């Protein structure tokens, strides 16, 4: 196969990435897509991503949002969204997925997010929000918070290693 043919075939998206997910995971992706599709038109566009960041008190530079949009070959509908994430998540573990999600809110790229941002993320009404009692239970587990900042890598490790039970019972 020529270099050009290899390059062309490697860029082709088959959609088979979606087949690797079970129904529960696909439902979770649908919920995430619904959160990101701020204007509810079935397509995630630049405006949706800007609004999503704004809803979390963040301002994302146009260059960052443009780079996210360019990862897709066209409009990002649910199928394209699932395919993009399927390619990214193949072989990843839940901890890496959670770290990646929190990293979107890491303005300084330092491995930490503001405690207030963590609470906003966890109580976001568009996903499966934690209520006040669940947030209080989380604090009983002594999450890695220092100086108003959360070490989200340590937090992700804590909740993915079975420690979420410790968070609630501590």
Swiss-Prot record:
Gene Ontology terms: cellular component: cytoplasm; myosin II complex
Organism: Caenorhabditis elegans
Record-annotated EF-hand domain positions: 24-59, 93-128
Protein name (record): Myosin regulatory light chain 2
Assembly: Myosin is a hexamer of 2 heavy chains and 4 light chains (two regulatory light chains and two essential light chains).
Gene Ontology annotations of biological process type: locomotion; nematode larval development; regulation of muscle contraction; regulation of nematode pharyngeal pumping
Keywords from the named record: Calcium, Metal-binding, Motor protein, Myosin, Repeat
GO MF assignments: calcium ion binding; myosin heavy chain binding
Region annotation Disordered: where it falls in the sequence: 1-22
């Amino acid at each position: 196969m020529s270099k050009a043919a290899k390059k062309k075939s490697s860029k082709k998206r088959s959609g088979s990435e979606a087949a690797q997910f079970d129904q529960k995971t696909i439902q979770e992706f649908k919920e995430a897509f619904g959160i990101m599709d701020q204007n509810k038109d079935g397509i995630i566009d630049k405006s949706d991503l800007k609004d999503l960041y704004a809803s979390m008190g963040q301002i994302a530079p146009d260059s960052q949002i443009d780079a996210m949009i360019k990862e897709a070959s066209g409009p990002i509908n649910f199928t394209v969204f699932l395919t993009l994430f399927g390619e990214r998540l193949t072989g990843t573990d839940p901890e890496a997925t959670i770290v990646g999600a929190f990293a979107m809110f890491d303005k300084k790229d330092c491995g930490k997010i503001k405690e207030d941002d963590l609470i906003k993320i966890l109580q976001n009404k568009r996903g499966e929000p934690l209520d006040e009692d669940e947030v209080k239970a989380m604090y009983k587990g002594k999450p890695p918070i220092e100086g108003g900042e959360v070490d989200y890598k340590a937090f992700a490790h804590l909740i993915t290693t079975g420690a979420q039970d410790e968070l609630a019972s501590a």
